[in-house]
């Protein structure tokens, strides 16, 4: 309870403390590229990038996690407890079209989902929705045939969904306030090296890879940063990779 209350305070703090024009520098750096989808401004804090995919895979390599090849490997990881089920609750729901066999993730990723969904629910009285979780290489290859923008199924930029550390959270339909709330929540965790997020435009979702350090960190409840002088103008790029390099 103390952790959830503190996380709510933290997210609200970042929202209130930041000036409205803080994204100006970041917009200029991207040559004022303003995109719209159904009339909604697309200007995410965490843009997908090659470097982000590299960082996600570096973290998976640090953890020595396998890229799950097929359903046989997937079921074995479930049986061993290495993958745990994502269960719906008052604060969390799962997209109805997501195959029940893939409603699984690593234990620390589920911890992250539980905390974020409870914080979000207390603030907005609505649920966070999980659109995607663990995938197999077989599934990822099939996805690539239908979506050329999907991450590869192998190599240094392979999809982090293949290791079960990543979830996609619904972004479509959220208000500006709700999006800003989630972005600032992720910004702080990213700065601590606990998550590596991206905001995907094609599927309008928050793609979030979670480090195993999250479970240990959440037990400390030492989550209050120094007061920011302005809203973040760009995501703290080297977060996960820098932390991994120190181990």
Regions found by a protein language model. Give the residues of each.
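Stable alpha-helical elements in mature extracytoplasmic
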Residues: 105-112, 116, 139, 178-185
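Short secondary-structure capping micro-motifs at structural edges
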Residues: 100-101, 114-119, 153-155
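Active-site-adjacent loop/helix surface patches within enzyme catalytic domains
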Residues: 141-156
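Extracytoplasmic cell-surface/polysaccharide-interacting catalytic and binding patches
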Residues: 2, 9-112, 200-203, 209-236
């Amino acid at each position: 309870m103390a952790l959830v209350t503190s996380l709510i305070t933290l997210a609200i703090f970042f929202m209130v403390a930041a000036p409205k024009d803080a994204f100006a520098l970041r917009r200029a750096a991207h040559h004022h590229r303003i995109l719209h989808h159904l009339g909604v401004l697309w200007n995410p804090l965490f843009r997908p990038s090659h470097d982000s995919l590299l960082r996600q895979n570096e973290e998976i390599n640090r953890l020595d996690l396998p890229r799950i090849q097929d359903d046989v490997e997937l079921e074995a990881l479930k049986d061993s407890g290495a993958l745990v089920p994502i269960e719906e609750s008052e604060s969390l729901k799962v997209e109805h079209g997501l195959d029940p066999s893939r409603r699984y993730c690593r234990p620390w990723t589920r911890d992250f989902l539980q905390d974020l969904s409870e914080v979000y629910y207390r603030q907005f009285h609505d649920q966070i929705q999980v659109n995607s979780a663990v995938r197999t290489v077989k599934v990822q290859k099939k996805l690539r045939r239908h979506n050329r923008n999907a991450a590869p199924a192998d190599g240094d930029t392979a999809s982090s969904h293949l290791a079960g550390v990543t979830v996609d959270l619904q972004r479509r339909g959220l208000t500006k306030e709700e999006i800003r709330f989630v972005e600032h929540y992720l910004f702080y965790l990213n700065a601590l090296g606990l998550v590596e997020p991206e905001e995907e435009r094609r599927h309008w979702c928050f793609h979030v890879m979670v480090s195993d350090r999250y479970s240990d960190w959440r037990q400390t409840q030492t989550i209050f940063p120094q007061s920011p002088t302005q809203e973040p103008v760009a995501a703290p790029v080297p977060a996960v990779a820098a932390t991994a390099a120190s181990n």
